[in-house]
Amino acid sequence: MKKVGVIGGGAWGTALALTARRAGRDVVLWAREPQVVDDINVRHVNSDFLPGIDLDPALRATVDLADAADADAVLLVSPAQHLRAAARALAPHWRAGVPAVICSKGIELSTCALMQDAIAAELPQAPIAVLSGPTFAIEVARGLPTAITLACAAPELGRKLVEALGTASFRPYLSDDLVGAQIGGAVKNVLAIACGIVEGRGLGDNARAALITRGLAEMTRLAMAKGGRPETLMGLSGLGDLILTASSTQSRNYSWASPWARAAPWPTSWASAIR
């Protein structure tokens, strides 16, 4: 795989584009914002979403979806609730057989569909893979050691994608359990918010440990009910992602919930927030 397209010019999309460049690929990054494209192409930074990181001058950004879709593999890094719309916009430009690598974590609110199902509906000609695991974009961009799950039903394609993205500091581990990888990446966000609440209310480390452990058990049961395998949830895209997101102040879900819970009156505002 010589050329990789990346759809999404946020922190994670930019970090993945930089990783693919380090792996020796030609990379075109699509961003919605013209100022982000200009920042990347002219100043070789993404000051809006990934400040403080110098980008490879050979990394090229564009506002043209067709340009980014003209690749040997395309990473879909738009926010989960907008991923279907992004795939629909890409469909006229997509060549049959080009893999779509889902790099966004979540479950579609309007349909309760996994990202895999949403993308398959819009890009039926695309083989699908999922990239998910314990990753903060800033650490990946800095080249700090990172391991991640790459799930793909086709073993040969999976190996090609691992080779296309893997570097000395970014290690994809191949799996064929797309469902398990997606459930882990989505549900850990809910548990991270819950752990932030535990921290904010001063309920202690015992409570957080219990929440992570029992949350993992529920996450595993959900994955199995959807056709995933329990061992996937014990790996990088399950337990690994959960530990990272539910215990670090770099986690947006955890860091949002903790101060909110500290300040919120109990219990009336909780019901309001849930609604």
Curated annotation (Swiss-Prot):
Reactions accelerated catalytically: sn-glycerol 3-phosphate + NAD(+) = dihydroxyacetone phosphate + NADH + H(+); sn-glycerol 3-phosphate + NADP(+) = dihydroxyacetone phosphate + NADPH + H(+)
Lineage, opening ranks: Bacteria, Pseudomonadati, Pseudomonadota, Alphaproteobacteria, Rhodospirillales
Any one biological process term the GO annotation gives: glycerophospholipid metabolic process
Residue positions binding sn-glycerol 3-phosphate: 105, 133, 135, 188, 241, 251-253
PROSITE patterns: NAD_G3PDH (PS00957)
Coiled-coil ranges (or none): none
Domain of life: Bacteria
Native species: Paramagnetospirillum magneticum (strain ATCC 700264 / AMB-1)
PANTHER family in the record: GLYCEROL-3-PHOSPHATE DEHYDROGENASE, GLYCEROL-3-PHOSPHATE DEHYDROGENASE [NAD(+)] 2, CHLOROPLASTIC
Cell compartment(s), UniProt: Cytoplasm
Protein family: Belongs to the NAD-dependent glycerol-3-phosphate dehydrogenase family.
Positions contributing to NADPH binding: 12, 32, 105, 137, 252
Listed name of the protein: Glycerol-3-phosphate dehydrogenase [NAD(P)+]
Pathway annotation: Membrane lipid metabolism; glycerophospholipid metabolism
Pfam families, A to Z: NAD_Gly3P_dh_C (PF07479), NAD_Gly3P_dh_N (PF01210)
One Gene Ontology CC term in the entry: cytosol
Function: Catalyzes the reduction of the glycolytic intermediate dihydroxyacetone phosphate (DHAP) to sn-glycerol 3-phosphate (G3P), the key precursor for phospholipid synthesis.
EC number: 1.1.1.94
InterPro entries to which the protein is assigned, alphabetical: 6-PGluconate_DH-like_C_sf (IPR008927), 6PGD_dom2 (IPR013328), G3P_DH_NAD-dep (IPR006168), G3P_DH_NAD-dep_C (IPR006109), G3P_DH_NAD-dep_N (IPR011128), NAD(P)-bd_dom_sf (IPR036291)
Catalytic site: 188 (proton acceptor)
A GO MF label: glycerol-3-phosphate dehydrogenase [NAD(P)+] activity
Keyword Phosphoprotein in record: no
Swiss-Prot/TrEMBL keywords: Cytoplasm, Lipid biosynthesis, Lipid metabolism, NAD, NADP, Nucleotide-binding, Oxidoreductase, Phospholipid biosynthesis, Phospholipid metabolism
